[in-house]
Amino acid sequence: MPHFPQTQTKTRSPRVRVPNSESIRFNLGGRQVSAVLQKISLTGGLAEFTASIGSATIAEAKLNTISGQVNGLVEFLPSPDGTAYPFRFIALSDDDYERLSSTIKVMQQQGFGA
């Protein structure tokens, strides 16, 4: 059953800083674009692109983690500078959600909490 992360809760989802310039890939209307993942949480993240992605609002995201590949549907939020784009997950499978959750827990234990 798909998981739809809820962002309207009173408790903010824990964020972690992503070290080592980890890559995340987005499918923007058939165009594959890579970015550097800066922060990640169970509800979204922040990706740094080399150039503006234009008016794209919805994309498929693929991220390799220590727990396995995470695939999800994301919505981009307005960029403060034209290259760093916050995004929120709008759909994740149960397995992808569990892999992401496990990865974030390990990163928190390693001291990468944001």
List where the protein language model places each region.
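Short strand-connecting beta-turns/loops that link adjacent beta-strands
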Residues: 29, 42, 52-54, 79-82
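Residue-level recognition of beta-strand microenvironments
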Residues: 40, 77-79, 92
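Short, solvent-exposed secondary-structure boundary/capping segments
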Residues: 45-49, 81-91
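N-terminal helix initiation/capping motif
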Residues: 1-42, 101, 105-114
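Short, surface-exposed secondary-structure edge patches
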Residues: 13, 48-54
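Extended Gly/Ser/Thr-rich low-complexity repeat segments
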Residues: 58-67, 97-109
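Short conserved beta-strand and strand-loop elements enriched in small hydrophobics
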Residues: 21-27, 56-69
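Short beta-strand-centered aromatic/proline hotspots
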Residues: 35, 71-77
